[in-house]
Amino acid sequence: MIPLSYRPGGNMNILLISLPEKNKDMKLEATEVLPLALYSLSSVLKCQGYEVSIIDPCEFVYLDEKENAETTCVTLIEECLEEGYDIVGFSVNTFNWGITKTVVNQISWKKNTTVVLGGLHVSVFDEYSLLTTKADIIMRGEGELTWCELVATLKNVAPLDTIKGITYKSGKNIIRNPDRGAMTIEDLEALPLPDYELLPIDNPYVEMPVESSRGCQFSCSFCSIPHRHNWRGLCEIQVIERVKHAKRHMKNIMRGGNILFVDDCFSMHPKRAIKILDALHKCYGEEMKYFIEARISNILSGEFLEGFQRNLISQMQIGVECGYDEGLKKIKKGLTIAQLYKGLRIIEEKGLSSVANLSFIIGFPWEDFGTIEKTLDTVEYIVNRFGILCRVNWFMLLPSDC
């Protein structure tokens, strides 16, 4: 519950948690990439002078599951709560929402602990998330600035009604404050480097995530990205510093040693992307590889692959999503099949077919067997003609997809 009083001026002790997903066998499943948001938020809050601890998803996975997955999670969290935390925050997405909801409701929370949920899923279903859990506050949208304001407000026992971007319980009522706008480039560049010192020694991670931009300049109809037509790219110097920081902490991950750019579109500003890759090549040569996401439109412009350091890329993921022109128009992809094939020929000429990775979606609401077959025919042609890996996924209706 939201406590009636904190000690004004006293320090705040915060616990940040991201629960793992459950697989088809109902067992907890580890991912290969660490939850960047958790470690970034830890640094932000520590810079404000607060005490922060993290429970990484892999710590739940590595426990002996003598009972069910939820009980395993509840047991570990309740043991940690004995340390006495003022605020406990959960990072929530659609895939871990089910287990997060159950765990939050099964924990016996102390009266002086505030429970906060953040992430895309609860940002969309904020009121429902409060009505169905013991959580006190929902953090909507980008959370770094909102978290700082929220913790300061709770610390000073001030009203919550001035904090943009939160939904909260007030007695039997649910209050939804106005939205907070997207963070500016200046805001993003002012963020401290992620708190990788808190990574568990034993972990399954194979790549270090780095954020060089947020948002997307486009607005595909199926996409869950919250900030459309609002791409914000960090300057090259900032990006290189973040990569260097990740490189210094490569020893903290158990396997691998590559960088994963978590940007929704690394190639959005082609000249900037090339400058970043060139600078990284000067720093590390071919010692490290980089995962990036790109758009066919950027490849067609000719700028992105001009002087491209092919040996630096571990994977270049490109979202195509639909294998026929009518479908591409419906999802507002801004692409035709003819343009796709032209872009793939450029990729082939640059010797990048082996690292390219195309994604497709089947089962859009308007599709039938005939239209799905068109996409599968396109995929078959690409694999046979260009030797490029294609991934086909069923359409999944997730928050903000429509």
Protein language model regions, located:
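N-terminal [4Fe-4S]-dependent radical SAM core
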Residues: 6, 12-15, 20-27, 163, ...
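Residue-level recognition of beta-strand->loop/alpha-helix junctions
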Residues: 18, 56-61, 91, 227, ...
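Flexible glycine/acidic-rich beta-alpha junction loops that bind and position SAM and/or redox cofactors
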Residues: 23, 61-63, 171, 218, ...
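Glycine- and acidic-residue-enriched helix-capping/strand-helix junction motifs
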Residues: 25-38
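Radical SAM [4Fe-4S] cluster-binding motif and immediate context
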Residues: 33, 186-355, 362-364
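Glycine-rich beta-alpha loop elements in corrinoid/cobalamin-binding modules
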Residues: 44-182, 400
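Short helix-capping segments at alpha-helix termini
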Residues: 49-50, 107-113, 158-159, 281-288, ...
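Catalytic cores of alpha/beta
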Residues: 128-131, 366-380
